[in-house]
């Protein structure tokens, strides 16, 4: 199955992540939003605690394990394991963990970054960071041509 939306999803999430790096008040198409500042993690234990909290919110205690990954190329999710390149500062951010956790929530239905994944991503973002953050992400998806979600 092809993953034709991958580049657009990554571009949208990069825009959203940059907004989270700043956080705080934001004028958003005439509305006043307050975005959270995204968390940055210093070690694997903090990442695991964060993912454990996301799992607990969904009633899935211990469902996902976080482990280090060699290199700096990319984070990855497969079979209940999130692999994070710890040497890469970009990978130790909340937006990356939420992206990989959304793969778990999507359960592999459809293309890796298709409508089911994007719907799952919006769901976990709303739960972890609030409706404002999810709204900004949804708008970034729209701006990058991948606004349709399942």
Predicted regions span which residues?
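Walker B catalytic acidic pair
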Residues: 100
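Active-site-proximal or metal-binding-adjacent scaffold patches in catalytic folds
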Residues: 1-95, 104-150
């Amino acid at each position: 199955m092809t993953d034709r939306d991958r580049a657009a999803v990554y571009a949208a999430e990069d825009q959203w992540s940059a907004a989270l790096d700043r956080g705080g008040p934001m004028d958003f198409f005439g509305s006043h939003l307050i975005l959270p500042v995204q968390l940055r993690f210093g070690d694997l234990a903090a990442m695991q605690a964060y993912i454990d909290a996301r799992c607990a919110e969904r009633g899935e205690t211990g469902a996902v394990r976080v482990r280090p990954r060699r290199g700096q190329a990319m984070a990855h999710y497969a079979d209940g394991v999130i692999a994070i390149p710890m040497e890469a500062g970009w990978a130790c951010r909340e937006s990356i963990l939420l992206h990989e956790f959304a793969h778990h929530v999507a359960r592999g239905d459809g293309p890796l970054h298709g409508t089911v994944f994007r719907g799952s991503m919006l769901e976990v973002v709303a739960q972890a960071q609030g409706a404002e953050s999810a709204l900004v992400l949804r708008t970034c998806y729209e701006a990058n041509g991948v606004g349709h979600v399942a």
